[in-house]
Regions:
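AMP-binding/adenylate-forming catalytic core of the ANL superfamily
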Residues: 91-94, 98, 108-110, 259, ...
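Conserved AMP-binding/adenylate-forming core of the ANL superfamily
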Residues: 12-67, 71-75, 92-97, 149, ...
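Gly/Ser/Thr-rich phosphate-binding loop
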Residues: 256-261, 274-340, 358
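Conserved ATP-dependent adenylate/AMP-binding module captured primarily in the ANL superfamily
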Residues: 91-125, 194-211, 243-257
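Structural core segment of the AMP-binding/adenylate-forming
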Residues: 51-52, 79-149, 478
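Conserved AMP-binding/adenylation subdomain of ANL enzymes
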Residues: 192-209, 216-258, 268-274
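Conserved pre-ATP/AMP-binding loop-to-beta segment of ANL
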Residues: 11-14, 150-173, 180, 187-189, ...
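Conserved ATP/PPi-binding loop(s) of AMP-dependent carboxylate-activating enzymes
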Residues: 349-358, 366-402, 438
Length: 538
């Protein structure tokens, strides 16, 4: 496999490293593995999984923070042909129970704790006679003695169940407008194609050193770092949770050449030139960002003051893979808000991504393809990076008749000729809180029984630090006391909702805006909340 070949080619090169303060977060010392050690460690864990009765095709939930063991899990599960379903550590029992019911896992792999999160206790909520709880440090470990008999067992298993690069490797999770996380199956080949697009966008070089601060459970980290690192023999340094001071220290001390960071952090660093200048970032070549719109002034500051280019990424677990780099434009305004129309046969964009993917924009009413600048429509995507459909759903309206994925995102064609997409909004209602995607419909459903309210729905409101936060919009029952923010939080926490999804504001209305079918018109709620902000009626 890819890892074995890199272990032979670069046995002593660093493959993956923990952050230096891991002991405070997990009670374990930081770990650093070379490519040879990663190959060996993942083989040991693969043998331990086989010992537990896990076989090819079995599904395993993995709830781990950004630590070395998570990278080992990806490699180990791949070696036995099983399917890994990574989930954020913020997920609570509510989300885990839904995921478990959807994929019928044979095991959940986790830690005792991560900071204040008691991960093993949360995982116990879904374990039963058919689901094993496997805790690193107790049930699984990287330091077991090599057992020739177990190695032979693994070899025999691999011969009996050879890996097909088109078979599912991961089931990641994305929040949808239906109100619950949806499973996104992705194969080895889908990840490899995404990795090649990301490597091209970031101009990755053999032997690069990456600093990863996004949770290693979705597109940004798996496609942006994990697979490119295995393809090119690059090193991954891990970071979690976000600590700006530690992040800067790691950039310097680990001699990082490329990193991804959320726009909120880059904005903060662009405003903190004294802090930035305390460190030596001479090895850093460029920085990627995404998950929310970028600020042109931030891109310009990094270029003019720090000598670094910022690359704008736009992707999703489903396989959207767009990016805007210095090769596409030097204009900060354009790079912050637009993406080249890859996969449209446009001259000047000759690249792997332009050949591997297809994209187009269609009118949301007629479905006709839009080709002229200034027109807005839904972005459709196809090609080697794109998944085949959500797990456990019919996917009838998810793909066009000619096989394109309906992204649910609105884009405008820009330029003369129209060579760029500008993200114009969302067909979907997803709330993006600091890069964590939250389904408002999921919270609506849980809040239906809230005492004191006759109607309730949540919507996004703008926040300088997180981008968006959750606002609970209530219609208070006659003669009832208005529910407080604590009432809402307690009610949701008792149902197992993850804390990052909790509303952080309440607004009361005489009635909720609805369409003729009775569906809440969330965009009207958002406008009303925004208007109250402008009028100072908080």
């Amino acid at each position: 496999g890819l890892l074995a070949s890199k272990a032979l080619e670069y046995p002593d090169r660093l493959a993956v490293a923990d952050q230096p303060n891991r002991l405070d977060l997990t009670d374990d010392k930081p770990c650093r593995l070379s490519f040879a050690e990663l190959d060996e460690g993942s083989t040991q864990v693969a043998c331990q999984l086989l010992d537990r009765g896990i076989r090819a095709g079995d599904r395993i939930i993995v709830q781990l923070p950004n630590i070395v063991e998570l990278v080992v899990c990806y490699m180990a599960v791949s070696k036995i042909g099983a399917i890994i379903s990574p989930v954020p550590v913020q997920y609570g029992s509510h989300e885990l129970q839904h995921i478990s019911a959807t994929i019928s896992p044979v095991a959940i792999v986790t830690l005792e704790r991560f900071g204040a999160l008691e991960l093993s206790k949360t995982a116990e909520s879904i374990t039963n006679g058919s689901i094993q709880l496997l805790v690193f440090g107790t049930d699984l470990n990287l330091v077991s003695t090599q057992d020739s008999q177990k190695c032979l067992q693994l070899q025999n298993h691999q011969e009996s169940f050879p890996i097909d690069a088109d078979q599912t490797l991961t089931i990641c999770w994305t929040s949808g407008t239906t109100g619950t996380p949806k499973g996104v199956p992705r194969s080895h080949n889908m990840w490899i194609s995404t990795a090649r697009c990301c490597a091209e966008a970031g101009n990755y070089q053999q032997g690069d050193r990456f600093l990863n601060i996004f949770p290693l459970v979705n597109m940004a980290s798996i496609g942006g770092f994990l697979y490119p690192a295995i393809l090119l023999g690059c090193s991954i340094v891990l970071h979690h949770p976000l600590d700006p001071g530690l992040y800067l220290a790691q950039l310097q001390d680990e001699q990082i050449t490329f990193t991804l960071a959320p726009p909120v952090l880059l904005n903060q660093l662009a405003k903190s030139q004294d802090m930035w200048n305390r460190f030596d970032f001479s090895q850093l070549r460029s920085i990627g960002s995404g998950s929310a719109p970028l600020a042109p002034w931030m891109i310009e500051t990094f270029r003019q003051q720090y000598g670094l280019e910022v690359i704008n990424f736009y992707g999703s677990n489903e396989g959207i893979s767009l990016f805007c780099t210095p090769m596409h434009t030097a204009d900060s305004e354009v790079r912050a808000t637009m993406f080249p129309r890859l996969g449209c046969g446009i001259a000047g964009f000759d690249s792997y991504a332009n050949r591997a993917i297809l994209s187009k924009v269609v009118d949301t009413e007629t479905g006709e393809t839009i080709t002229e600048s200034g027109h807005v429509g839904e972005l459709l995507f196809a090609g080697a990076t794109v998944f085949d459909g959500y797990l456990g759903t019919d996917n009838d309206e998810l793909f066009s008749d000619d096989g394109y994925f309906h992204t649910g995102d609105l884009v405008e064609l820009c330029g003369d000729p129209p060579a760029f997409y500008r993200i114009a909004g969302r067909c979907k209602d997803i709330i993006n809180r600091g890069g964590m995607k939250i389904s408002p419909a999921e919270i609506d459903i849980l809040l239906e029984g809230l005492t004191g309210s006759s109607e309730v729905a949540v919507c996004a409101y703008q926040d300088d630090a997180q981008g968006e936060k959750v606002c609970a919009c209530l219609v208070v029952e006659p003669d009832a006391d208005k529910p407080t923010l604590d009432d809402v939080a307690d009610y949701l926490l008792k149902q197992g909702l993850a804390k990052f999804k909790l509303p952080e504001r309440i607004e009361c209305f005489d009635g909720l805006p609805r369409n003729p079918l009775g569906k809440v018109q969330r965009f009207i709620l958002e406008d009303a909340v925004r208007q109250r902000d402008q009028e100072g009626k908080l």
